[in-house]
Curated annotation (Swiss-Prot):
Its EC number is 7.2.1.-. This is Ion-translocating oxidoreductase complex subunit E. It comes from the Archaea. The gene is rnfE. It comes from Methanosarcina acetivorans (strain ATCC 35395 / DSM 2834 / JCM 12185 / C2A). The keyword Translocase applies. Coiled coil: none annotated. It is found in: Cell membrane. GO terms for biological process: electron transport chain. InterPro entries: NqrDE/RnfAE (IPR003667), RnfE (IPR010968).
Length: 213
């Protein structure tokens, strides 16, 4: 699941692996706290995922670049410092340029520091692979996380409000067609949505495995 550099590795397969097989939510089952908390809308999902993607790329790149010079006794503290540096950049940029989104995401922006996805990729991949492939891994995992948060946020926002309108752009408006279920924008809706999606994903994987795929 977390390979060292192999002769048969290529950037495209590594990128796709992060979106599909090792998807942070449906493959590795990591980072569920922000996934549950911030996916009340597509806008929130995009904001959190883009921030996490930036931190993933930056921390993977930096950890991979300095990995041979990090003593084992201080490995984790060094990784946390690196991650916290990039999270601070995200926090300051969001506060300056997207204040409404910054307020909406709240404490979950600084909590990216301890997001299992970011720490997990630094530990399991960046420490064992070169800079280029560590960046590719981060892009794949970050893109997979982005797609999942958009999907979950879209489902919850549509069923909870009848409208999907990220950043003021109305993409779907079914307010006059469906009766919004407000609980979908609350915690029970988050658990229900993720449970249904995980059930579908696991069922499809079992079907594929049964067919020898």
């Amino acid at each position: 699941m977390y390979p060292h550099r192999r002769a048969d590795m290529n950037p495209i397969s590594e990128f796709i692996r992060g979106i599909t097989k090792d998807n942070p939510t449906f493959g590795l089952v990591l980072g569920l706290c922000p996934t549950l908390a911030v996916t009340t809308s597509v806008e929130n999902g995009i904001g959190m995922a883009m921030g996490t993607l930036f931190v993933l790329v930056g921390s993977n790149m930096m950890v991979s670049a300095i990995r041979k010079g990090i003593p084992g006794t201080v490995r984790l503290p060094v990784e946390i410092i690196v991650i916290a540096t990039f999270v601070t950049i995200v926090d300051m940029v969001m506060e300056a340029f997207t204040p409404d989104l910054y307020t909406s995401l709240g404490v979950f922006i600084p909590l990216i520091v301890v997001n299992c996805i970011v720490i997990g990729r630094a530990e399991a991949y960046a420490l064992k692979n070169g800079v280029f492939y560590s960046i590719i891994d981060a892009l794949g995992e970050g893109t997979g996380f982005l797609l999942v948060l958009i999907l979950i946020g879209g489902i919850r926002e549509l069923l909870g409000t009848g409208i999907i309108d990220p950043f003021g752009m109305t993409l779907i408006n079914l307010s006059g067609v469906i009766n919004p279920a407000m609980f979908m924008t609350m915690s029970p809706g988050a658990f229900l949505t993720i449970a249904v999606l995980m059930t579908i994903v696991n069922y499809r994987r079992q079907q594929k495995a049964a067919k020898g795929g």
